[in-house]
């Protein structure tokens, strides 16, 4: 049954009228899935989450005792933050994850529809399931902030903020009013996650939450902040700027033969000299001498040869294996962002999200006015906040795609090496290190996923073959980052000197894993021992159990969606299809969706028919570890889950190989006229190189708008 746009508009106007009264209820934000394009084509309705969306006014009501005696800032008058919440249909999660994209000024709908949310968007602007969605591990809330970002609005435009302190205050106002509307969420464990410039937002917001908890009256529930999750974060501008040239040399992006290489060296030296001259009372957030290095690096790596395609002129700063047009150099990437824009411009979508189409701006990924205003004349970089947060007991996970240039691994590891917290500087001699594998239970395959380093509440995860947007490249693998925090991984403890191994999988929900494991243990107790002699029966052992597992695996195969590979498929087809996107009619779109569904059914059927017996899988897994990692025959999976708080490994348990970040390993550093300190951490890139596949250059379609300035962080 179709709902007219006029009726939707009327409903939305009534909704907005309620906003000003402070009487909003949870039911006012319910999203009807059938009003969103593409949802009706999803055959497995269990993949469609509960959804809530809309504007939450920052001045909805004063909810703290302290605010009752303070004048409300005019800047928050008629200011509304847009949020979109996703909740699993059948799993009641104890976790609530707030996701923030960076910029500053970039919409968190990137996270919702390109990275970690339950849906991706195809080239026709229609939703389809994201197999690696994080909503199976916790409720997800994506927020467009600060003012001027995405679908958030303010009547006081251009009332843009210039300091992270103000941005943090507004976030607390949002949380107060969010928890007024969703009071049960205050009982959940809160995780604040995000990427890029969210490396500034998240620590500042965490500090603001701690201060808020201290101020509120005893009869009010505190916000139970448990963990911060920062992907490819921009946290320490000075240290990270100094990482650009050494990292580019390490990855063979530049060298002595690069034109204007000497200019790069001088720029690096100029940045270092500026830092050396900074006084202790200097309040600068960043320095132009250092920020200019990335622009210069992009400039000297341009390919101006006559035969080069216009969309392959310069390096993509978010994935150095890719190319882009100049001066975008990554701003046109990923192509899926254009699909998101098409989704939000589809008639009826804005109204379905409980917004008034006449009052919200046309959605765009990033607002550069927000970026230009947020200069932080008062606040200092968030790296200064990390020690206090770590010492307060909050877990912090920093995860990085290893192919990112703008917020690269070296910058993060150098920052950690200088950080002092919980009685030591950098990772201590009690640091725990792991190799990380991802196991696809559907395809019965494994692949190296990255490395994990943990010490004193801080975890650093390097993700193999991933970009600045880890969950975009490695959707289902990236969900393993949450599984590592939730102890939802297998641990293989090794008796050799190499690190232990963590294994994450594509199990759809955490509860499914626990239920399957418990059922297996019960069946083992029931069928594994015969009456009378107490010995196992080879003929009867596990018959019913194996049958049940086979049926479950078949069900999982049918439920699993192949959409995790969509980014590569879309990118491969974009050059041919983009010109036709606007001409596609509804019937063609529906046919495409039906064809895709049929193909997925065939793939699922084929995989189901060739499914390996569960016990054979375990045997193959153990053989793999024995052959590849040198595990002794007596060694097995010693525990199903692991905890970082277990007894630390000894320092001689790790590889002593030198780091590629060490300048002594650079082929082109003989003539350098500056010193770069050795990276104190072992290499995160020296494992599984034979198994890693380097991407080919992927061209961005030439018809994409090239009017962007050099991509922001």
UniProtKB/Swiss-Prot annotation:
Composition bias type Low complexity, residue spans: 651-667
Where does this chain mainly localize?
Answer: Golgi
**EC no.?**
3.4.16.6
For whether the record's keyword set contains Chloroplast, the answer is no
Write out the catalytic residues in the record. Answer: 196, 404, 468
* Annotated transmembrane regions: 617-637
Reaction equations catalysed: Preferential release of a C-terminal arginine or lysine residue
InterPro entries, per database record: AB_hydrolase_fold, Peptidase_S10, Ser_caboxypep_ser_AS
Q: Does the keyword Cell wall biogenesis/degradation apply?
A: no
An example Gene Ontology CC term for this record:
membrane
SUPFAM superfamilies associated with the record? alpha/beta-Hydrolases
Q: PROSITE patterns this protein is in?
A: CARBOXYPEPT_SER_SER
**Annotated Gene3D superfamilies:** alpha/beta hydrolase
Residue stretches of biased makeup (Basic residues): 686-695
The enzyme's main class, written as a single word, is hydrolase
Q: Where is this region: Disordered?
A: 500-612, 650-696
| One BP term from GO | proteolysis
Biased composition regions of type Acidic residues, renumbered to the chain: 512-522, 553-601, 668-678
Disulphide bridges, residue numbers? none
- What glycosylation sites does the entry record? 457, 465
A Pfam match:
Peptidase_S10
Q: Which GO terms describe its molecular function?
A: serine-type carboxypeptidase activity
Q: Which residues point to the Cytoplasmic side?
A: 638-713
Q: Please state which protein family the record places this protein in.
A: Belongs to the peptidase S10 family.
Task: List the protein's name.
Answer: Pheromone-processing carboxypeptidase KEX1
- Originating species: Vanderwaltozyma polyspora (strain ATCC 22028 / DSM 70294 / BCRC 21397 / CBS 2163 / NBRC 10782 / NRRL Y-8283 / UCD 57-17)
């Amino acid at each position: 049954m179709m709902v007219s746009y006029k009726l939707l508009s009327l409903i939305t106007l009534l909704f907005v009228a309620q906003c000003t009264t402070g009487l909003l209820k949870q039911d006012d934000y319910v999203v009807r899935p059938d009003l969103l394009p593409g949802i009706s084509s999803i055959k497995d309705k269990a993949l469609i989450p509960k959804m809530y969306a809309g504007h939450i006014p920052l001045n909805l009501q004063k909810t703290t005792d302290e605010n009752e005696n303070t004048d409300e800032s005019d800047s928050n008058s008629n200011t509304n933050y847009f949020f979109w919440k996703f909740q699993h249909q059948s799993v009641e999660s104890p976790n609530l994850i707030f996701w923030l994209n960076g910029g500053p000024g970039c919409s968190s709908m990137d996270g919702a529809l390109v990275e970690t949310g339950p849906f991706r968007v195809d080239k026709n602007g229609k939703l389809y399931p994201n197999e690696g969605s994080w909503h199976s591990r916790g409720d997800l809330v994506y927020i467009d902030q600060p003012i001027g970002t995405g679908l958030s609005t303010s009547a006081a435009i251009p009332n843009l903020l210039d300091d992270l302190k103000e941005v943090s205050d507004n976030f607390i106002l949002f949380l107060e009013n969010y928890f007024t509307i969703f009071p049960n969420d205050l009982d959940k464990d809160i995780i604040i996650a995000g990427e890029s410039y969210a490396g500034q937002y998240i620590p500042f917001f965490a500090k603001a939450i701690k201060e808020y908890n201290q101020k509120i009256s005893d009869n009010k529930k505190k916000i139970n902040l448990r963990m911060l999750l920062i992907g490819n974060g921009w946290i320490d501008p000075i240290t990270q700027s100094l990482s650009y040239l050494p990292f580019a040399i390490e990855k063979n992006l530049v060298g002595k033969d690069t034109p204007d290489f000497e200019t790069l060296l001088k720029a690096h030296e100029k940045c270092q000299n500026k830092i050396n001259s900074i006084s202790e009372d200097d309040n600068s957030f960043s320095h132009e001498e250092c920020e200019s290095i990335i622009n210069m690096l992009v400039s000297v790596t341009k390919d101006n040869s006559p035969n080069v395609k216009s969309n392959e002129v310069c390096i993509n700063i978010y994935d150095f294996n890719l190319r882009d047009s100049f001066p975008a150099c990554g701003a046109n990437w990923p192509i899926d962002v254009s699909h998101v824009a098409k989704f939000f411009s589809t008639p009826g979508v804005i109204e379905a999200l409980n917004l008034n189409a006449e009052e919200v701006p046309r959605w765009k990924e990033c607002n550069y006015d927000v970026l230009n205003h947020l200069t932080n004349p008062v606040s200092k970089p968030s790296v200064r906040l990390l020690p206090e947060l770590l010492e307060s007991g909050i877990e912090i996970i920093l995860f990085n795609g290893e192919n990112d240039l703008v917020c690269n691994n070296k910058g993060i590891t150098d920052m950690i090496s200088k950080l002092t917290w919980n009685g030591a500087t950098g990772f201590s001699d009690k640091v725990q290190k792991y190799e990380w594998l991802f196991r696809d239970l559907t395809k019965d395959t494994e692949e190296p996923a990255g490395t994990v380093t943990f010490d004193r509440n801080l975890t650093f995860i390097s993700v193999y073959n991933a970009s600045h947007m880890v969950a975009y490249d490695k959707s289902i693998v990236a969900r393993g980052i949450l599984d590592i925090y939730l102890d939802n991984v297998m641990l293989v403890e090794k008796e050799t000197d190499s690190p232990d191994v963590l294994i994450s999988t594509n199990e759809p929900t955490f509860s499914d894993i626990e239920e399957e494991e418990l059922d297996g243990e019960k069946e083992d107790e029931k069928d594994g021992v015969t009456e009378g002699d107490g010995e196992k029966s080879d003929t009867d052992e596990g018959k019913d159990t194996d049958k049940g597992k086979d049926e479950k695996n078949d069900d999982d195969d049918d439920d699993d969606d192949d959409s995790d590979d969509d980014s590569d498929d879309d990118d491969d087809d974009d050059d041919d299809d983009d010109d036709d996107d606007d001409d596609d009619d509804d019937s063609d779109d529906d046919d495409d969706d039906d064809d895709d569904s049929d193909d997925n059914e065939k793939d699922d059927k084929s995989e189901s028919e060739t499914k390996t017996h569960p016990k054979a899988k375990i045997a193959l897994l153990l053989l793999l570890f024995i052959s590849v990692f040198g595990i002794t025959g007596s060694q097995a999976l010693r525990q199903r889950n692991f905890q970082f708080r277990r007894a630390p490994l000894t320092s001689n348990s790790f590889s002593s190989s030198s780091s590629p970040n060490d300048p002594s390993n650079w082929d082109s550093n003989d003539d350098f006229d500056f010193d770069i300190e050795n990276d104190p951490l072992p290499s995160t890139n020296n494992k599984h190189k034979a198994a890693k596949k380097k991407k080919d250059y992927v061209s961005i379609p030439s018809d994409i708008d090239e009017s962007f300035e050099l991509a922001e962080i």
